Amino acid sequence: VLERLGKQTYPHFEIIIADSKSKDHTKEVSLKHGATWLEDPSRNRADACNFALRQMDHDLVLFTDDDTIPPLDWVEKTVRWFENPEVGAVGGPNFAPDEDSWGSKCADVSFCTRFMTAGTRYGAQPKGELVPITHNPGVNCAHRMANLREVDFFEPGCIGAEDVVLDAKIQRAGHKIFIDPSNVMPHRRRKPFVPFMKQMRNYGYTRMIANRRWPEIATWSHTAIGFFPLIVVASILSMVLGLVASDFSLFPSMGPAR
């Protein structure tokens, strides 16, 4: 990620790493690539971002993750939209890169389809050049620093869905959020099944907590998908009861012996 950020077509920007007690030589790698390394005492992404943001003095802030492959024109394609004063924040879709495994690309479906994510799609690609949207995932988005300061940055202590809550705060303050469908960020997915299922469990849990505190980020589809496990159990029970009621047997009688 740092290597590709260092080769961007946009000439002047600062790369900042908020390092929360990592054990993988993050400091050495960051300094090697000319990034600003901050030793962060936080224990979650929201607080880590706030720790870094409060030490920054820039007009625009771009966010991405350490498991992405930033296109070399990503910064340039993102910041150009802020020439329009109506743009409070802008982002783009993200998909599994071409070199990811078949299993990871299957997992990509869970992030990029409306049905599987209750309407919150990481891979949303609406038609148009710059399209209004209610949320951009934190892996590929940018905000005006003035707006971030106005809403007091991320919600402190938010253990998940912090990017969703931030976008809600930004819009509550009267600012508009857009998506550039062409500005795609390749984003590696966790491999099925155990790592991916753990991630999905955590997403569901944290989104449920966020929905209760910020009702405006919840939609009917979030509530509906919560009934999915009950529907599955009810379907299985109905099938079993139906088989019992119909005297179904795996070993049907062959009739009386002659």
Where are these regions (language model features)?
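Short aromatic/hydrophobic "clamp" motif used to bind/position activated sugar donors
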Residues: 61
